[in-house]
Each structure stands twice: as structure tokens, then as C-alpha cells.
Amino acid sequence: MPVQAPQWTDFLSCPICTQTFDETIRKPISLGCGHTVCKMCLNKLHRKACPFDQTTINTDIELLPVNSALLQLVGAQVPEQQPITLCSGVEDTKHYEEAKKCVEELALYLKPLSSARGVGLNSTTQSVLSRPMQRKLVTLVHCQLVEEEGRIRAMRAARSLGERTVTELILQHQNPQQLSSNLWAAVRARGCQFLGPAMQEEALKLVLLALEDGSALSRKVLVLFVVQRLEPRFPQASKTSIGHVVQLLYRASCFKVTKRDEDSSLMQLKEEFRTYEALRREHDSQIVQIAMEAGLRIAPDQWSSLLYGDQSHKSHMQSIIDKLQTPASFAQSVQELTIALQRTGDPANLNRLRPHLELLANIDPSPDAPPPTWEQLENGLVAVRTVVHGLVDYIQNHSKKGADQQQPPQHSKYKTYMCRDMKQRGGCPRGASCTFAHSQEELEKFRKMNKRLVPRRPLSASLGQLNEVGLPSAAILPDEGAVDLPSRKPPALPNGIVSTGNTVTQLIPRGTDPSYDSSLKPGKIDHLSSSAPGSPPDLLESVPKSISALPVNPHSIPPRGPADLPPMPVTKPLQMVPRGSQLYPAQQTDVYYQDPRGAAPPFEPAPYQQGMYYTPPPQCVSRFVRPPPSAPEPAPPYLDHYPPYLQERVVNSQYGTQPQQYPPIYPSHYDGRRVYPAPSYTREEIFRESPIPIEIPPAAVPSYVPESRERYQQIESYYPVAPHPTQIRPSYLREPPYSRLPPPPQPHPSLDELHRRRKEIMAQLEERKVISPPPFAPSPTLPPTFHPEEFLDEDLKVAGKYKGNDYSQYSPWSCDTIGSYIGTKDAKPKDVVAAGSVEMMNVESKGMRDQRLDLQRRAAETSDDDLIPFGDRPTVSRFGAISRTSKTIYQGAGPMQAMAPQGAPTKSINISDYSPYGTHGGWGASPYSPHQNIPSQGHFSERERISMSEVASHGKPLPSAEREQLRLELQQLNHQISQQTQLRGLEAVSNRLVLQREANTLAGQSQPPPPPPPKWPGMISSEQLSLELHQVEREIGKRTRELSMENQCSLDMKSKLNTSKQAENGQPEPQNKVPAEDLTLTFSDVPNGSALTQENISLLSNKTSSLNLSEDPEGGGDNNDSQRSGVTPSSAP
């Protein structure tokens, strides 16, 4: 029975007794069949036949010469000249001796593999020959030259060695970088395609799945089947690419094709290819054949990497290559080598090998070939010795790749463990190709190299994780290259931004939700650049969990994070706005950062930072500018970035204490907590935000809406009037459907004029801007560090100028009322009742704030996102631009108009909760023109009070006289606006006019002036709006008359009535919204400017029902207007 042949690497031991050959008892005797056995085992054979292939041994064993080549490899003494009796003459003997000498010399290249038991193979003794060359050389060494069959085998082995040598030389002259590209180019040139190891394997398995049962399918059906199955895992799969894979199999003749008349042919898989192994082998064979046709010579290990992505299929590929070899392939390879040498100049003079190679190529490899003569044998072996020597010489002296050319690419485990074969057996059959270490020195060398590579890997991994979280790696990695991971110590903010400390996440959104708002997800900060000053990387790096509680929830009400977030110790508001910081892409989403205001000096004017991008005060802050995500505009850096609102709240609304760290960081979305430069909201939005009429500069810049804005980028033409630092602060790009994007202001010219008047009034108020702390006694007002001078017209510039950190921290929505209004996402008119009485607002500021939050949430939940002029999807969080809880820390934007969002009833709110917004209500209007900006309560400067006059509803009322005058003016403006609104209502008879009015009213909601017609929330149809407009117009006529009568009433009464009326109006149908005028009046009347909570609103509505009736002409008209504008008036208690 045949014995299993040993591994070719065990050529130094007897395959029968497994003992190493020696020169005494176990002399190696080679048989004509190519097997070598020790003489002792041969003598014990029962039959004179090879124990492995049963070939008969015709020659006397004693006459067979010892294989001296193997003896020299085992270190044994080679016997001197052995008598050869099998040679017919002296000449033959001479040829024999020369041939044997050639074999012995070639065998020396096997010395590194010479011992399976201890000679050892290490990095210095590894053979320069490749594994295929060594294997072919072993075959040659085992040939018995005295036997005729042995000589035939020796010639074939010599030819094979010569052919492999040519291939090796061609490989040495190839550019490995171009090898794969040349291969796939050749494959594509034949209408085929390789999709990569994993995808190609799946595609082939699916083809087999469809056809293994013998079914016949058309090519189209087969391709569709494969594509549909591949799509879940490989979305890039296409009919074209899969069709090319099928073409590859078709080219390989794997299908039995049945043609049909006037119909597509049917393809049936041939029976021999209905297993994956057979199909894959034919597939691989076809690719190898294409490569050979293209003149490419690729090593088996390279094939394994290309087709399988590993090194475990080298033998498989080698067998395919061998089968594809033809007698003509050798001569063709010689020609290709000649061409390659001409291209390189042949520095090693390899052309001298050409005659020898041609001689070897002319050897007939067929088994039926006649046996060679002794002379032919000698010539053939001399030629193969010459070409192998030439190859070794070239590899050692001229090759750039050297002996390691076949080594697979290094990876993390490459040669970091000892080779098992080397340890156990003292030698490794894989030689230089082994991926394990063969010596301790080699092991230590690669382990050290691996350690150097490790740090980079974790970084990329951490970046990948951050990306998964939604943080762009650019935002994560600042120019400094520091990666700020939550676990890592937050590095100082780049570009002069001071990190507030690990406890406060600088990038925390103002939203209450600790989790990043999906819209705010860092991943959405696509435009943030690592180099952007105040780039999120550092800011993001340490996001305290407490801060995380201040997640960038665009919709969520600002978290009452102050408690959660320790006040940031930032003296200066962090400058989160990069100079050209991509952090604040034009499409900046509101990046919510903690408002570490408490730590920062309250209202410290934020000087424009060098890196900060400041837009002219009148212009909308770049933050609102929404450049294409690809080119995020650096938001105007507010020196006082919105101080983390958390700190504001933590500081008990001591604005001064909380630096405005992130104003620029907060992008387009208006957060109740951030102060935005008077955003160019649709006036409706502004009206909604605060009853106080606010001049809203026409939106010159696309709204700042972050990602959600991105959808509306072109629509976003709104820019805050003054780029308040807070307004500017880019926030994480949000896509919150409710991102607070004021609808583009579309007020009629008259309304614009009214708004301008309001702005003037607000400017005056701001000049006086000593806003007594909002009635929210409970919350200590942070002393505003605002400089009254700076707050005036500079408000537009406030973002950069406001030294009062609080202002910079204030966001238009920063005020409690406003915050809640904003929190309600423009607190919907329904939800928000215009605060008519300042006292009520003050008294119930907290409770109302909570109610406002509820209202805001509801409003946000309502499908009417009136503020969003861009479409059904609201840009502002459904909970309000600033929906926040009393604890939410709001960073006051720079001196921004402090206005109570009309929907936000002012409650006695802990300013600490809204620390940035002393008068929450008034500040909520901060989105308005900076003139209306209101310093934090308790810290309001006179200017603040002035702004509070209008913001009176937002903050403490100005001195009664001034207040009343301002109120009168505001009321007049409101009446005018309402009248204009009525006129518009008449014009709105047509649906288009109605829609425009609605947009205006929406805009008006955000500001006292009649809002431009913003897009109505998708909830309200144009027909409904038109009907409402007609009704409103009728009511307006009535109320106008009533108002004229009521105008006679004292201004105080009017303000109170307006407030109460707004409170009631805030209750009206969502469609009915308080006109901007009413809102402004109510806000001016309402000291805190904060919207009443629903309960307070209900109470106010009940109490003021009679007042409303009397003031309905005015308030009702306004309400109707506001309804048209889509804003619900909010009443301040």
C-alpha cells in the first residue's frame, strides 16, 4: 500500500523512517520517480517498487549513486568520486559529473531549510529565493540523473525553474503600486469586474444560490436577484457592476446558454460548477488568465491578497497559475522580460541570461517527450544554474524590494509572535514569507514597531467613535491636534477660547436634553473646522455629564442646567466662534454650549475677538448666515459667547458671573437661552418672541438655521439685526424641525416702518436700559456688565462689542419670558399669552416659566411652526427656540433686545435659571434689535431699563413716565401695525395675500411690528387662513374703533390691558396670534416680558376678559393680526 508522501520541506529526512540522512547507514538514494529514500529502508522493501507511487525500480539499488546534494545539506561528509557504471562512456560520465555539480550548487540555496531539527532558520539565513523557487529546486535535487526517467524529470524541473526565474525577474521590474490598477484595468477592458474580496464572494454565492438547482435564468433576472440580495450589505451594488461579474463567469464558460428567438437567452450553470469551490476556482482562473494576456506577472501571495484579502490562498493561486502555464508561456515571458529590461536600461546586464532562458524555453515539458541526451542534460542544468545565479545576484545587488518582496503588508500582529515551526522544529518552511518572528531579535524589533503604531490607531478609533456620535472629526481635532474626548482632560480652547473646565461642556447645547439633539449632533457640525477658533474639538472634548444634561436639544426646553452644571469659571465668555471657524458653518446649527456665565463677569462686553467673525451690527450675524455646509462661515465670534446658560442659571442669573462662552458657537437655531443678534426673524417671529415691538432689520443673511436650516438655506435670508455674540454663536448644526429660524421677515413696508419706530423706541429704552430686575424676585439678577453706551445701536455689534458678558450671553430668547416664548419655539400664540402686566409676570415668573415651557413644548409640538418660513418642517425646536426649564442656563447674547417672547409668561424666575437673562421676558426678545437687548435682571444698567421700557414686559418697566411714553409709542405703533395688518387682511382676501399676511403675522409674532407673512405651519391651510383673516379683519375694524376709545385711557391702563389681553390672546386659537404690536405693547407693559404659564394665562384671561372686551378693539385687532401672523400673544402676569 502506498505511503503518504512527506511535505516537500522535509527533503532532508527519509520519508519512510523519518530519520535524517547521513553518509553511513542512511545514505539518501534518489529513485527515477523523484522520491528519495535512505538506503536502509530501500533494502527492507519487499518489492522493488517505490513505496509512494509504486513505480518499479528497474535498477539495482546498489548501483544507484548517493544523492550528494542532500548529503551536503545535512552537513555530512560527501564521499569522493563515486564509480558510475550506468554511463555508457567517458563523455557521458563527464556530462553526468557536470550536471551533478550544477545540482549540488543549486542545492546550496536550500541551506536555510537544510535542517528540520536544529540547523535553524533565522532572519540572517533566510533564503533569497522565493518559496516557489525553493520548491522547484527541491524537485530538481531529488532527480536521479542516472535513470532515464530521472533525467527527463530533471529537464522538466530545469525548465520550470527557468520559467519561474523569468517571472521573478519580471516581478522585480514591475511597479507594485501599479500592479493592481493594471490588473483591474485589464479586467474591465474585457467587460468584467472584480468588486473586492468580500463583495465578489457574496455575489458569486448569490449567483450560485440562484442557479445551483439547475434553473435557467436570463441575465437580467439573475443580475436583479443578486443586486437585491446584496443591497442590504453592499449598498453600492449596482446592476452594472453585478452584470460585469456575471460576464466574468460567462467568459469563463461557466454557463450553458440557451438562446431564444426574440427574447433574452437563458443561462444555466454547468453541473461541474454548481459548488462554490469549483465556481470560485474557475472565476479566479479567468482573472489570472486575463492578467497573463495583459502581460502581468503576479506572485501567488499577491494573487491571494488581491482576490481574497489574505495570505492563506497562495497554494490555491499557485496551482491555478501552474495549470495555466503553456509551452508558449515561457517564451512569451522571455520576450516580456526583454521589453522590461529595455525600459529600465538593464543595469544588472540580465540580457546575458537570454540565451540560457531561450534554451530552457525550448525544452519539451510533455511527459511523452524523448529522454534528453547527456549533453542536453548538462546544457540544461548549466543554463538553469546560470539563470538562478543571475536572479540571486539581481535580488541581492539591484533589487529595491530585496528578498522581502513577497512579505505581506505589515499589520498589527506582523512578526509579534514567534513562529511555531521555528520553535518546535527549528525551521520554518515559509521562510521569508512567514508572518511570525524567527528570532528573538526580530520579535522585539516588530513589537517595538507595533507599539509605535498603536497610538495612532486609538486616535482614529476614537475619532470614528466620535463620528458615530455625530461629531465631525474636524470639529474634534483642533489644529493643535488634540482630540478632546469626554474622558480626556479638556485642553484649552483654541483661538483664545478659554475652556470652562471639564465640569462644563463648552459645546453643550442650550437645550435641556442632555443628549445631543439629533439636529445638534456633532456629526452635524460638518462645517466645523478643527482649526476654527473655539473649535468644538476642545469644547467638545470634556463634556461633563452634568453639561451633557444641557444637551444640544434644539427642541428641548433649556435644561435647568445651572444646578447640573457648575458655573463655568471663565472670566471671559468663551470665544467659541472661530475666526473662519468652520465650527460655525453658515448653515450653522445652533451649537449649544454651556453657558458658563456665572464664572464670567456679568455682561462683560465681549470685544470682538480677532478670530471672531463679526458682522456689522445691523447685519445679521454671520451665525445666521447660512453658507453652504461645505463652506461653513465662521460665526461672528462673540467675545461673550453665550455664556453657558447653565452657569447663568447656576449663578442665579448673575449674568456677570457667567461668561458668554459660546455665543458664536450657537448657530442658527435660536435658543431661548442664547442671545442672538437681533435676528432677522420674520417679524412674526420677533413679535412672537416679545410683545415689545422690535425693529427687525430685514434679513440680509440667510437664516442661521443649522442643519434644519440647511434644508432651507436659501430660504434662510434672515439675519439677526445685530449679530449678537450669542446670536452669532454657531451652534451644532441642528436639523431640529423646530430650529428656531425666524421666517424671513416679509412685513409690509408700513410694518417695517413701524418696526423701525419700535427699534428707535427700543434703542431709547436701551439707552436708558436700566431694566429693573424683572419682577422675578426669586432669581437674583446677575449684575450686567453691559456698558449702556455699547448696548445702543451697537447692539447689532453687540455680539463683539458687548462687554457685558450677560448681554453677549443673552440670546434673544435668553429672557425667561422670551426663553419660554422661544422655548415654545416662538411660543405659539396659543400657548403664549402676551404678558400684559409686569407685576403678574414678576409674581408668577417661575411658575409661568414652567407653564411657558409646557406651552412651548406644546407649541413646538403643534405642527404650526409659524416661525419657519421655509416649509412645513419647523426650523425651531418644537419646544421653542429656547424652550427651557427654569433651571436651564441661558447664555445671554450680547446686548440683545431683551424681550419676553410673547408666549413666555414671565414668572418669578430664578435669574440663576436664566441667569443670562435678568428679565427673561424682556430678554427673550433679544433676537430683536440689540437695542432691545436687556441686561440680566438685577444687573441691568439704565440702558437695560430703557430697553426694558419696551422690554418692560420683558424686564422691569422703565421709569413710569418714560415707560408710559414708550408704551404709548409702542401702542401707537402696535395700533398702526394692527391697522396695517387689517389692511393686509383685506388684501389677504386672496389666498396669496392671506398667506403673505400669515407670514407677516408670523413674523409679527416674533416682533411687535406687523410680522411679514411667514409660511404658516403646515397645519393651517391657506383657505383657513383666509377665512381667519377675514374674521380678523372684521374684528380689527371693531377693535380699532374700540382702541381709539381705549387710547384715551391712561397708558398704564392700556399697558395692563394689553398685557392681560395678550395673556388672553395667548390663549386663542393657534391660528389667532397676537399681532406684533400687541406683543410689543404687552411686553413693554410686562416688566419681565415673560409669558404667563398656561395657568397664569388662564387666570389672566379670566380676569382680563372684561378688559379684553374693552380693549379688544386694540388687543383683539392685534390678536387677529397676530393670528394672521401666526403668533399667539403671550400674556405676562
UniProtKB/Swiss-Prot annotation:
Keywords: Cytoplasm, Disease variant, Metal-binding, Phosphoprotein, Repeat, RNA-binding, Transferase, Zinc, Zinc-finger
Catalytic activity, EC: 2.3.2.27
GO cellular component: cytoplasmic stress granule; P-body
Tissue: Widely expressed. Expressed at higher level in cerebellum, spleen, ovary and liver.
Biased composition (Low complexity): 1096-1110
Compartment(s) where it occurs, according to its Swiss-Prot or TrEMBL record: Cytoplasm, P-body; Cytoplasmic granule
Summary of subunit composition and partner proteins: Able to homodimerize. Interacts with DDX6 and EDC4. Interacts with CCR4-NOT deadenylase complex. Interacts with RC3H1; the interaction is RNA independent.
This protein's name: Roquin-1
Gene field: RC3H1
